[in-house]
């Protein structure tokens, strides 16, 4: 029951301090509900019977990463290094690293039940749309880690998106947004932009193999794609899109909903991309 903390908090607060006590109880109860949700147990037939939402997020992420690596034909040394680098970046302890390694190994298996795993993950996350979207973005970012999205990887990502409730059009939009967003982290762009030292352009090129590979620095068109807007949209529309995306990717809010704290840096990077894209549009349009 998601609201048990609020109910108890309001009841006890009212008994102790009347109206203002109830308000205080509601606030404390809300905090308790978030913590209970974050640490609450969920069932997973693939990993183990009971686990926390945060461990489920972590294990599912690495299992899918293993599956994505295998989808290209074979798992390369580069794929394994990427997984290890991600574990280091997330600062996993020994127990967390073992969970991640086991999940990655199981994800590489030919009979990995991708749809079943994602369905259980979706249920375990309580159908939280922003958390599910963040999960998919983690996988998309991992697929682009070698600066190329293989067609087989794209099909696996679409299976995940489909199980998470996204349409093909929504999925294609997310891929386009991610390709554009990567322009804002390549070569330390965000830091350069903050210092006013950025010059140049950026575009993605489609390869003959059916995959995608980036070229060099971000364009205004990339910025529009990151926010999911068009050049003709009014300032109010662009601002609404910017605020919505910043709210969806707020690291603290995502952690409260079940994102492992170790993945906060990924969420922060996403907000930096969104901020840089919005700033670029405002500068080009002369908006304050």
UniProtKB/Swiss-Prot annotation:
One of its GO terms (cellular component) is plasma membrane. Residues 31-288 are cytoplasmic. Residues 222-288 form the J domain. SMART domains: DnaJ. GO terms for molecular function: protein-folding chaperone binding. SUPFAM superfamilies: Chaperone J-domain. It is found in: Cell inner membrane. The chain crosses the membrane at residues 7-30. Keywords: Cell inner membrane, Cell membrane, Chaperone, Membrane, Transmembrane, Transmembrane helix. It is a single-pass type III membrane protein. The keyword tRNA-binding does not apply. HAMAP family: DjlA. Regulatory DnaK co-chaperone. Direct interaction between DnaK and DjlA is needed for the induction of the wcaABCDE operon, involved in the synthesis of a colanic acid polysaccharide capsule, possibly through activation of the RcsB/RcsC phosphotransfer signaling pathway. The colanic acid capsule may help the bacterium survive conditions outside the host. This is Co-chaperone protein DjlA. It comes from Haemophilus influenzae (strain ATCC 51907 / DSM 11121 / KW20 / Rd).
């Amino acid at each position: 029951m998601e609201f048990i903390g609020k109910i108890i908090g309001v009841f006890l607060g009212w008994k102790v301090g009347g109206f203002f006590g109830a308000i205080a109880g509601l606030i404390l109860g809300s905090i308790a509900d978030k913590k209970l949700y974050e640490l609450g147990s969920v069932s997973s037939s693939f990993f183990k019977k009971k686990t926390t939402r945060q461990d489920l997020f972590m294990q599912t992420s690495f299992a899918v990463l293993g599956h994505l690596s295998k989808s290209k034909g074979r798992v390369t040394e580069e794929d394994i290094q990427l997984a290890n680098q991600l574990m280091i970046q997330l600062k996993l302890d020994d127990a967390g690293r073992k969970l991640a390694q086991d999940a990655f190994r199981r994800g590489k298996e030919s009979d990995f039940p991708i749809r079943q795993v994602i369905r259980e993950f979706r249920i375990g996350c309580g159908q939280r749309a922003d958390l599910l979207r963040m999960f998919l973005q983690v996988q998309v970012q991992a697929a682009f880690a070698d600066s190329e999205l293989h067609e087989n990887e794209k099909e696996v990502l679409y299976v995940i998106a489909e199980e998470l409730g996204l349409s093909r059009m929504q999925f294609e939009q997310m891929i386009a947004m991610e390709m554009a967003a990567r322009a804002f982290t390549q070569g330390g762009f965000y830091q350069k932009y903050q210092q006013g030292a950025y010059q140049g352009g950026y575009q993605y090129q489609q390869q003959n193999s059916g995959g995608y590979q980036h070229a060099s620095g971000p364009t205004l068109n990339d910025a529009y794609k990151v926010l999911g807007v068009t050049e003709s949209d009014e300032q109010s529309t662009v601002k609404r899109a910017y605020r919505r995306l910043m709210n969806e990717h707020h690291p603290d809010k995502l952690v409260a909903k079940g994102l492992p704290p170790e993945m906060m840096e990924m969420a922060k990077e996403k907000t930096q991309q969104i901020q840089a894209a919005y700033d670029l549009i405002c500068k080009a349009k002369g908006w304050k």
